[in-house]
Design a protein with these regions (language model features):
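Non-catalytic accessory regions
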Residues: 1-67, 78
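Generalized protein targeting/export and membrane-interface segments
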Residues: 14, 42-43, 53-144, 194-212
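Conserved NTP-handling cores and scaffolds of large molecular machines
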Residues: 15-18, 87, 161-172
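A short, glycine/Asx- and small/polar-enriched loop/turn
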Residues: 33, 100-102, 186-189
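Long, charged, glycine-rich C-terminal linkers/tails
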Residues: 89-99, 170-183
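Alpha/propeptide regions of enzymes that mature by internal proteolysis
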Residues: 148-152
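Mixed-charge, glycine-accented linear interaction segment located at domain edges/termini
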Residues: 156, 160, 164, 207-212
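Low-complexity, intrinsically disordered Gly/Pro/Thr-rich segments
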Residues: 182, 186-194
Length: 212
């Protein structure tokens, strides 16, 4: 299982850096993680910094979904690094703004013992960069390769999440991924979180039903 420890998230949680400076740290950490480690003090240390960020963002909302949303975001942020080879951090407050248009969304619903839907929404430039990171191919404009790449990423990630739920005796089935353009999500028990990455910012959306 991937570690939930993230040097860059520890730094971000301490509010020491403006967003532009944090983006520079993410880019540099992608090339050499020790560059971020040198900025880390003992006071910054947190073995589960993504969990800390998501719990703060949720506060007292959606208590029945809290464990699932926190666990999913920990898995999502780990996958950013292991599957997309991209350094990223998540905000500690809910996201309320829609993405700049044109933007694209990819999501997938899990049904069974629980109902859960999750995915991402990104402006076109960021969506393409994320697709390039996953496919390891250049994608200069929106096409089927971009769409298919992020559908596959979400499908693999959500499959891993479904397996982790199964280990807790929570059985779920994966539905087919969904794709949308210029989406303003409105799911039940919805949580939107902004993720800042070395290729740009986007949002992760979690809900108990489809939001596309």
């Amino acid at each position: 299982m991937a570690s939930n420890f993230s040097i860059v998230q520890c730094l971000f949680n301490r509010d020491k850096y403006e967003l532009e400076e944090m983006r520079r740290i993410l880019v540099e950490a992608e090339q050499d993680e020790s560059s971020a480690a040198k900025l880390l003090s003992e006071d910054d240390m947190d073995i589960n910094p993504v969990r800390t960020a998501v719990l703060r963002s949720m506060g007292k909302i959606h208590p029945a979904q809290m464990d699932y949303y926190v666990d999913y975001m920990e898995m999502f942020m780990a996958a950013m690094k292991t599957m997309l080879h991209t350094e990223a951090v998540v905000e500690r407050v809910p996201c309320t703004e829609d993405e700049e248009q044109p933007c694209y969304a990819t999501s997938q619903r899990l049904s069974g013992d629980i109902n859960f839907a999750a995915g991402l929404i990104a402006s076109e430039p960021v969506y393409l960069k994320l697709a390039e990171r996953y496919s390891e191919e250049e994608i200069p404009e929106m096409d089927e390769l971009a769409k298919d790449s992020l559908e596959e990423f979400i499908n693999v990630l959500n499959g891993m999440f479904s397996v982790s739920l199964g280990e807790r005796k929570i059985e779920t089935d994966l539905e087919l991924p969904r794709f949308g353009k210029n989406v303003s999500p409105h799911g039940s028990h919805q949580l939107r979180l902004r993720v800042h990455s070395s290729v740009g910012s986007f949002q992760v959306v979690m809900a108990t039903d489809e939001f596309i």
